[in-house]
Amino acid sequence: SDGSFWLKETASEIFKLFWGNPNYDVTGNGGITGFFQWGDLDFFLLDNRYHRTSNNNFTEPRQMLGRDQIDWLINALSFSQAPFKFIVVGGQVLSTGAVYENYSTYPEERKYLLNKIREAKIEGIVFLDGDRHHTILSKMQENENVYPMYDLTCSPLTSGTNNDDESYNSYGIKETLVNIHNFGILNVSGPAKNRELTIEIFDKDGEELWTKSIKANDLKYK
C-alpha cells in the first residue's frame, strides 16, 4: 500500500491495537513512526507506507518516508548517545538495486537521507529491514573518510522465498545471502566503551547459517 490507501487511518488504529509499541506517530504527522530504547541501544521505527508515493507515480517528487519523518529522524539520531542506532524500515534501504519496493526506487529522497546522516556525522548506524523474501547483509562505505553503514535485510520466516541473487546490489555481502526460510538474532555485548553487535542468521529449524560481528568503535568517524 501507499499514501493513497483510503483506509490508512483505520489501518493505523488496528496496528496500535495489535502492537504494544511504547509510542506511535512521534512526528505528529500521521502514521506509526516510533522510538524505543533497550539498555544502551536506540531503535528508530519508521513508517514507509503512510506518506509513500505510489510505485507507479512519477508525475511529482517521489517520497517513501517524507521530509518531516526524515528531519525528525536526523534530529533524534543527533541527540542519541547510543553506541548502535538501529533504524528499522519496512523496505531495503542501502541496496543499490532500484527494484520492487526498494528505497533506490526513490533515489532523490534516499540520497537526501543518507547525505543528512553523513553531514550530521551521526555514528553507529545500522539499518534493519525486510520485505525481500530473502536475507542479505549490505555494507556501504563511500570512501576511507567515513565509517561503513550496515543494512541487515532479513526475511522470510513463514512467507514465500525467492532465488534472487542480489547481483544488482553493489553493497551486498554475497556470502550472507540466504534464499530459504530464516530468522535472525541480534546480540550486543561487551563493556560500555567497546560494545559489539553479533548478528546470527538461522534456518527455520534453528541451524545457524552465518554470523557476523560488528564493533561499535568501527562505526565512528576518524
Question: For each of these PLM feature ranges, what is it?
Answer:
Residues 1-222:
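Metal-dependent phosphoester/phosphodiester hydrolase catalytic core
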